[in-house]
C-alpha cells in the first residue's frame, strides 16, 4: 500500500479482507467476546493472532473495524484456551496447562486445528500457546513449564517439537519452521518489543498503515 509507484489502493483492504465491513460481527465464543469474524468462522487457529503481528505491533492498533487489535487477539487466544479446558471431546491431557490449537502437523498429515468440534483432533501444537506469550504471558508460561517437564517426548535439540497427541500416543520428533519462528519472535516481543519496534519504525510501514486507515493509541497497554 505504501509504494509510491505501484501501491495497491486502500480498497483492496476495505473491499477485500474487510469485506466492505462485513468482517465486523460481534459475538461470543466460550463466553468470551470477539468483535470480528474471519471467513465466516467464530474463532480459528491461533496463527490468526500471531503471524500478522510478528512485526506489526497490535498494542493500541485500531481502525474502523476493530477498536483494539491487541484485545481482539488476546480474546481469540483466551477462546482457544477455554475450549481446551472445556475439552468437549474428552481428549487426554487437555487442560489449563496444556492448550493450544493451530495449524501444524497432525495425526493424519497436516491440519488447521481450531477451537470447535469439527476442526480439532486432540493435537496440541506448542507454538500455539508459546507464541501467544504477548497476549497471555502467565497462561503461556504454564504451558511451557508443563511441556518442558515432559522431557524428550516433546523437546529436542531445536526446541519443542511441532505437535503431539496424548490421546493417540503420537509424539513425532520433527519440526516445522513456520511454527518454530513465531515462538522466538513473540518471546522477544514480549521481553523487549524489539521486532515490533524495528518493523513499526520503518516509514513505509507507517505510510501504509495511514493509507489503510489504521492508527495507534499507546495508552492501550498490554496486560502483564
Features from the language model and the residues they span:
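Ser/Thr/Asn(+Pro)-rich, low-complexity disordered segments
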Residues: 1-224
Amino acid at each position: 500500500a505504501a509504494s509510491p509507484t505501484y501501491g495497491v489502493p486502500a480498497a483492496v483492504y476495505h473491499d477485500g479482507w474487510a469485506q466492505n465491513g462485513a468482517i465486523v460481527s460481534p459475538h461470543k465464543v466460550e463466553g468470551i467476546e470477539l468483535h470480528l469474524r474471519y471467513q465466516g468462522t467464530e474463532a480459528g487457529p491461533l496463527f490468526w493472532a500471531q503471524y500478522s503481528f510478528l512485526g506489526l505491533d497490535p498494542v493500541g492498533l485500531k481502525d474502523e473495524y476493530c477498536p483494539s487489535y491487541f484485545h481482539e487477539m488476546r480474546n481469540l487466544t483466551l477462546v482457544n484456551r477455554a475450549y481446551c479446558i472445556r475439552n468437549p471431546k474428552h481428549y487426554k491431557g487437555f487442560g489449563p496447562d496444556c492448550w493450544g490449537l493451530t495449524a501444524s502437523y497432525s495425526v493424519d498429515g497436516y491440519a488447521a486445528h481450531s477451537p470447535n468440534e469439527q476442526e480439532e483432533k486432540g493435537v496440541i501444537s506448542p507454538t500455539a500457546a508459546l507464541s501467544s506469550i504477548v497476549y497471555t504471558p502467565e497462561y503461556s508460561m504454564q504451558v511451557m513449564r508443563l511441556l518442558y517437564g515432559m522431557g524428550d517426548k516433546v523437546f529436542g535439540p531445536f526446541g519443542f517439537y511441532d505437535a503431539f497427541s496424548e490421546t493417540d500416543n503420537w509424539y513425532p520428533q520433527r519440526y516445522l519452521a513456520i511454527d518454530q519462528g513465531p515462538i522466538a519472535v513473540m518471546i522477544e516481543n514480549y521481553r523487549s518489543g524489539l521486532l515490533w519496534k524495528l518493523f513499526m519504525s520503518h516509514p513505509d510501514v507507517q505510510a501504509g498503515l495511514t493509507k489503510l486507515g489504521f492508527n495507534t493509541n499507546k495508552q492501550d497497554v498490554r496486560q502483564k
